[in-house]
């Protein structure tokens, strides 16, 4: 008989969240006491907007670099299939506020300081879909998201600075 599982993200009521936000999904504890934290980094409002794949792909590549420059312990930052944001997996305990500040700072750099030469992993050797990138779209989305501010609470807007 298959094991009964509950997928947390499918239990979240996507109609009541207020993006953009960072939400702590879970803290997982390993057998030796290691902690892994999983965050919902929601950049656009579910079922109202979706970031096109080329822009999302470029944001993904940039966040892989920029987050690691700002905070230790990043394991992975992967886009949601719905294209509204990312899962951010981290070693150790981190607050939604700290992660929201890191994401804000990273998006500020994308919006204002990044050139094509700064985008990592854009060659046929380093990317599985290297033709599907758009720095223009990444910058446009970063600016739109920053205008709204990133909240550390998914249900009540509390924008971090």
Swiss-Prot record:
<feature type="binding site">
    <location>
        <position position="127"/>
    </location>
    <ligand>
        <name>Fe cation</name>
    </ligand>
</feature>
<comment type="subunit">
    <text>Homodimer.</text>
</comment>
<dbReference type="GO" id="GO:0043768">
    <property type="term" value="F:S-ribosylhomocysteine lyase activity"/>
</dbReference>
<dbReference type="Pfam" id="PF02664">
    <property type="entry name" value="LuxS"/>
</dbReference>
<keyword id="KW-0456">Lyase</keyword>
<comment type="similarity">
    <text>Belongs to the LuxS family.</text>
</comment>
<keyword id="KW-0408">Iron</keyword>
<keyword id="KW-0071">Autoinducer synthesis</keyword>
<protein>
    <recommendedName>
        <fullName>S-ribosylhomocysteine lyase</fullName>
        <ecNumber>4.4.1.21</ecNumber>
    </recommendedName>
</protein>
<dbReference type="InterPro" id="IPR003815">
    <property type="entry name" value="S-ribosylhomocysteinase"/>
</dbReference>
<dbReference type="InterPro" id="IPR011249">
    <property type="entry name" value="Metalloenz_LuxS/M16"/>
</dbReference>
<keyword id="KW-0479">Metal-binding</keyword>
<comment type="function">
    <text>Involved in the synthesis of autoinducer 2 (AI-2) which is secreted by bacteria and is used to communicate both the cell density and the metabolic potential of the environment. The regulation of gene expression in response to changes in cell density is called quorum sensing. Catalyzes the transformation of S-ribosylhomocysteine (RHC) to homocysteine (HC) and 4,5-dihydroxy-2,3-pentadione (DPD).</text>
</comment>
<dbReference type="GO" id="GO:0009372">
    <property type="term" value="P:quorum sensing"/>
</dbReference>
<feature type="binding site">
    <location>
        <position position="61"/>
    </location>
    <ligand>
        <name>Fe cation</name>
    </ligand>
</feature>
<keyword id="KW-0673">Quorum sensing</keyword>
<feature type="binding site">
    <location>
        <position position="57"/>
    </location>
    <ligand>
        <name>Fe cation</name>
    </ligand>
</feature>
<dbReference type="InterPro" id="IPR037005">
    <property type="entry name" value="LuxS_sf"/>
</dbReference>
<dbReference type="GO" id="GO:0005506">
    <property type="term" value="F:iron ion binding"/>
</dbReference>
């Amino acid at each position: 008989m298959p094991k009964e599982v509950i997928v947390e993200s499918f239990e979240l009521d996507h109609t009541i969240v207020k993006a953009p936000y960072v939400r702590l999904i879970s803290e997982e504890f390993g057998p030796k006491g290691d902690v892994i934290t999983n965050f919902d980094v929601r950049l656009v409002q579910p079922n109202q907007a979706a970031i096109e794949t080329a822009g999302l792909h470029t944001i993904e590549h940039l966040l892989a670099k920029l987050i690691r420059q700002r905070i230790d312990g990043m394991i992975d930052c992967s886009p949601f299939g719905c294209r509204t944001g990312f899962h951010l997996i981290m070693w150790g305990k981190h607050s939604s506020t700290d992660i929201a500040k890191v994401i804000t700072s990273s998006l500020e750099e994308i919006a204002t300081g990044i050139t094509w030469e700064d985008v990592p992993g854009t060659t046929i050797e380093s990317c599985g879909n290297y033709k599907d990138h758009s720095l223009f779209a990444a910058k446009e989305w970063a600016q739109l998201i920053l205008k709204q501010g990133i909240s550390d609470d998914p249900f009540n807007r509390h924008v971090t600075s």
